[in-house]
């Protein structure tokens, strides 16, 4: 069985995962600049948690290629990020990109623009503000796309598709 990583965990690592961060903090087992590579063997990881970290990535494409390298076939990647049309996306001055529900479709094609990734989007969940969260999904979709700050963040589950 492979590793379960929490990359960019800070001091709040998910239980049962190996903490990976740029800084040495409580719960962090591996200190590295994960945008410069990940110190794990090819195909050695079964699950990766990326909670509130992708908006900070200078080079998301290279990071996703590196992530794909270390994932075993079928590995799950759990992304949580501020929704691009939310206040939370703009409050943090260290955010360098804004993530939409379509961002990870870019990594969903093998050799798309020469990428070395094939992550399939398995699910997407949107955390809506009140009163929007009590509305039917059809209305939530419209409000999150066309109304500023209706959606706070989103969770995306990806799966690494590789030959076995």
Question: Where is each model-derived feature located?
Answer:
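Short, Lys/Arg-enriched, disordered terminal segments
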Residues: 1-2, 164
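Conserved SAM-binding loop
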Residues: 2-85
């Amino acid at each position: 069985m492979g590793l379960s990583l929490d990359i960019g965990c800070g001091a709040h690592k998910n239980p049962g995962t190996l903490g990976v961060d740029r800084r040495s903090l409580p719960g962090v087992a591996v200190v590295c600049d994960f945008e410069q590579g990940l110190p794990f063997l090819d195909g050695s990881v079964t699950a990766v948690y990326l909670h509130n970290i992708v908006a900070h990535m200078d080079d998301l494409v290279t990071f996703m290629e590196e992530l794909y390298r270390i994932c075993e076939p079928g590995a799950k990647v759990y992304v949580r990020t501020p929704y691009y049309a939310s206040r939370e996306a703009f409050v943090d001055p260290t955010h360098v990109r804004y993530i939409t529900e379509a961002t990870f479709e870019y990594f969903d094609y093998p050799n798309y623009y020469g990428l070395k990734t094939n992550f399939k989007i398995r699910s997407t969940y949107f955390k809506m503000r009140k009163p929007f969260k009590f509305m039917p999904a059809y209305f939530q979709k419209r409000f999150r796309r066309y109304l500023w700050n209706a959606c706070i963040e989103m969770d995306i589950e990806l799966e690494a598709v590789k030959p076995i």
